[in-house]
């Protein structure tokens, strides 16, 4: 019996069509997957941020930091410099920097020299004091303000806890260089906290010694620019009364109390406490920041 050639041809065509369909399916799948892949750091997209490593200062005392930029930016940008809490690093503020960049701000977060054992900046933990951190922030401001894409007339300082204290004190020294202050649970009571632990083993450090006779509240309040203070009502380190007292000292301050929030609005900023304390307040906090910046 002779084979039916039409049947063979039909089968061959069917196989060919299946192969073509398979190739098309693979190409379509690859395209869909590629569109879902996260853009790597350093790539520019209208929907993503550009992250750039920038070092400040001179050899031997260099300060590590990362700049977040809107992916489609052009011209001069308003800029926010973010200072982290005690014993943390730039990583604690990176999420905020990323969000600010999405809203059109150049945002730089950095490691204080000796700020923690995980710090990428040069410097020793044993040498860190409030005043070395003040000098660090001033060094950072000098470097960042000189960048081509930074609008020097719109530089804001944002800090959490000790970083908030440092930002506030730098603004007192350099009011003309600071367009505004954003302070998350600023530890203006840190001197009394340090004095409360005086004499305990391991507490006699350069940092604690430098704060014993230094009342921070006496050194703030003269900065004439706008100040935003955001404070948790359940903060176990900085009571709301501290933020309330500070807000009265400033001539142009806005205070927001976040009900139930502790000393950190997310796990990254709670440090070791983030493992067992619930903290997801960024969705409440950051819209306050955006609105304030746009005023």
Show which residues each predicted segment covers.
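C-terminal catalytic histidine-bearing segment of alpha/beta-hydrolase fold enzymes
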Residues: 253-295
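Conserved alpha/beta-hydrolase
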Residues: 99-122
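Active-site glycine-rich loops that stabilize anionic/oxyanionic intermediates
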Residues: 77, 84-88, 233
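Mobile cap/lid helix-loop segments that gate and shape the active-site cleft of serine hydrolases
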Residues: 186-219
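The serine-hydrolase catalytic nucleophile loop
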Residues: 86-98, 112, 241
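Alpha/beta-hydrolase active-site loop
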Residues: 92, 126-148
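N-terminal cap/lid segment of alpha/beta-hydrolase-fold proteins
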Residues: 39-74
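Short beta-strand/loop motif that positions the catalytic acidic residue
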Residues: 223, 229-231, 235
């Amino acid at each position: 019996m002779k084979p039916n050639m039409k049947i063979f041809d039909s089968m061959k065509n069917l196989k060919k069509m299946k192969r073509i369909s398979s190739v098309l399916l693979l190409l379509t799948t690859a395209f869909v997957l590629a569109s879902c892949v996260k853009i790597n750091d350093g790539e520019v997209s209208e929907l993503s941020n550009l992250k750039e490593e920038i070092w400040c200062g001179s050899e031997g005392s260099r300060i590590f930091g990362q700049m977040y930029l809107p992916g489609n930016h052009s011209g001069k940008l308003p800029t926010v410099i973010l200072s982290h809490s005690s014993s943390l690093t730039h990583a604690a503020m990176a999420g905020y920097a990323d969000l600010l960049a999405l809203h059109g701000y150049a945002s730089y977060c950095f490691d204080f020299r000796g700020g923690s054992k995980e710090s990428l900046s040069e410097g020793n933990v044993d040498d860190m004091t409030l005043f070395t951190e003040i000098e660090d922030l001033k060094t950072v401001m000098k470097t960042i303000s000189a960048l081509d894409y930074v609008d020097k007339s719109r530089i804001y300082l944002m800090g959490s806890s000790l970083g908030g204290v440092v930002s506030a004190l730098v603004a007192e020294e350099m009011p003309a260089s600071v367009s505004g202050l954003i302070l998350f649970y600023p530890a203006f009571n840190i001197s009394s906290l340090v004095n409360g632990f005086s004499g305990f083993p391991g507490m006699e450090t350069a940092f604690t010694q430098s704060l014993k006779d230094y009342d921070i509240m006496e050194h703030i309040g003269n900065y004439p620019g706008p100040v935003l203070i955001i404070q948790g009502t359940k903060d176990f380190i900085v009571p709301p009364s501290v933020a309330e007292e500070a807000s009265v000292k400033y001539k142009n301050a806005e205070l927001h109390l976040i009900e139930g929030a502790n000393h950190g609005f997310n796990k990254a900023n709670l440090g070791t406490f983030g493992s067992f304390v619930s903290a997801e307040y960024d969705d409440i906090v950051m819209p306050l920041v955006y609105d304030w910046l746009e005023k």
